[in-house]
From Swiss-Prot:
It holds the Pfam family ASL_C2. It is found in: Cytoplasm. One of its GO terms (biological process) is arginine biosynthetic process via ornithine. One of its GO terms (cellular component) is cytosol. GO terms for molecular function: argininosuccinate lyase activity. SUPFAM superfamilies: L-aspartase-like. InterPro entries: Arg_succ_lyase_C, Argininosuccinate_lyase, Fumarase/histidase_N, Fumarate_lyase_CS, Fumarate_lyase_fam, Fumarate_lyase_N, L-Aspartase-like. Its EC number is 4.3.2.1. This is Argininosuccinate lyase. Pathway: Amino-acid biosynthesis; L-arginine biosynthesis; L-arginine from L-ornithine and carbamoyl phosphate: step 3/3. Keywords: Amino-acid biosynthesis, Arginine biosynthesis, Cytoplasm, Lyase.
Amino acid sequence: MALWGGRFTQAADKRFKDFNDSLRFDYRLAEQDIQGSIGWSKALVKVNVLTIEEQHQLEQALNELLVEVRSNPQAILQDDAEDIHSWVESKLIDKVGNLGKKLHTGRSRNDQVAVDIKLWCKQRVVELQESVRNLQRHLVQTAENTQQAVMPGYTHLQRAQPITFAHWCMAYVEMFDRDYSRLTDAYNRMNTCPLGSGALAGTAYAVDRDSLAHDLGFAFATRNSLDSVSDRDHIVELLSIASLSMAHLSRFAEDMIIFNSGEANFVELSDRVTSGSSLMPQKKNPDACELIRGKTGRVIGSLTSMLITLKGLPLAYNKDMQEDKEGIFDALDTWQNCVDMATFVLDELKVNVERTREAALKGYSNATELADYLVSKGVPFRDSHHIVGETVVYAIEKGKGLEDLTIPEFRQFSEVVGDDVYEILSLQSCLDKRCAKGGVSPLRVAEAIAEAKTRFA
């Protein structure tokens, strides 16, 4: 049953109907559409469109329909309704007869779909935050277990300074914490109710929109009807957050892929998140991480698509806006699946502590310590930087680490070097000296882990 038709003398062509109908994807808004309809029925009582008895009858029927939807949401797809609003109204009329036709009084599908998608987005934010927090907890637990795993830190994919695997884990805790807080910010901005805005100019019935907003779990009603039915900022914002978080996940996945490579051999991924080759029997491929990395472009594509859809739309509602749903549904599903998979990857991750330490001892990652040592002896940093650079070249030519050079060799480049240089060139010294807040010193990392455990408890 179409919710329009009196204006038309011919039925819609089947080709147009197939092109126009959205039930195949907006069926996912069934629960929210029913929830909004119950709220609207209560608002109509207060403006004398419905009696209390009629409202109770409608609410009972809608709750029955809600139970049916929750038991088998896919059954909706067997219907030929235009969209989820048409489907809900049709099923309601089947249950209560002509009374069901009164529910849409003063309401447009424009404000109806606007409230549906906001209700859905609010629910998804809560679910996504729990998944993100769970990933953070797993990262913190992994960090706690790997505080002694010294490894190279990298810039430009070149060994730079020693860090610990725990410090690496806690870096991603911080990234995902920003994603979590962005979701909170987005939730607060979208927590306004557009229902009662009508098609664009507001409803002709003196509905108490603030009371309606509170009934539906919103903080307050939107302030402008024209904006209310045109607004899809919350979708763009969630797609933006999802895209940025997927970029974080992709970096996590890329690090894991590199660490898992035969050349690095820092970690071993569980058999449960890897696959083999149909030709090469020795292969153990990091498919979970590669798929996380690959799906990032898919989510970013949804953001780009939505921005392009919105950029040229005049006020107020346009059918183009129907294109908001498939992108947001797919992007948030993909994001949550990737967050959960990253959590699973961490579950049985093995860190090769001996190998990470061996790698940290190579690559002259203690060169900065030598430069700081010279500074402590009164050498200006810019000069010490140049001196250490020359020393590294010499060590490379001799096939030695800095810690393996003799004092006479050091003094070819600076006379201030003494026997105390060897202590500061050790990996432990490199870590211990980074004791400012946020640094890699074991004390600071332990503090960060303890603080995060308390925060995420």
